[in-house]
Amino acid sequence: MKKTNKESKSYLAKLLATENITVEHRKVPTAFFDLQKRLLVVPIWKQEMSNDVLDLLLSHEIGHALFTPMKEWKKAVDIDKIPHSFLNVIEDARIEKLVKRKYAGLRQTFIRGYRDLIEKDFFKTKDRDINDMLLIDRLNMHFKSSYIESDIDFTSAELDIVDRMKNLETFEDVKKLAKELSEYCSCLLYTSDAADD
């Protein structure tokens, strides 16, 4: 990526975040936002990413900057012992909805960016049947694929979870659903293991 493009995208990220966050470009597998340091890291990949993907990654991480409460996140993981992966997938769905609501012009950016990532097999799903994946992974792909276009199968009980994820508004909602979902999935695994014995 050209230096001027990096700089302009970094300034855009700061504007969207409505604060003077630090933006760094590093050789990392994916973008992330450090809630405590207020640091947004953008990956540098061997194969140059499209503007749609870059804008998607920035917009997604800006969602965390704007809407993910640091103290509550830390408490949810460290004290409430909610599995990080469940919390993250569910929080991602919430913050993406909220950032698209705040910046309506980003809706198509998310759709085009995720289409590009899915097409390039970023999520390693090309040679897999998504419907055979764990529920948390199917939920993640459902929301990443702009659930309007998703053809992922869910049971009626799972569709209730999908609907709840669509309607998340607060981080408290996220914590509650993540805890319930991790317990539900643990119960399914336990039941499946018992049936195999």
Regions found by a protein language model. Give the residues of each.
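Short, functionally important secondary-structure microenvironments
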Residues: M1-S192
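A short, hydrophobic C-terminal helix/tail in secreted or cell-surface proteins
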Residues: D193-D197
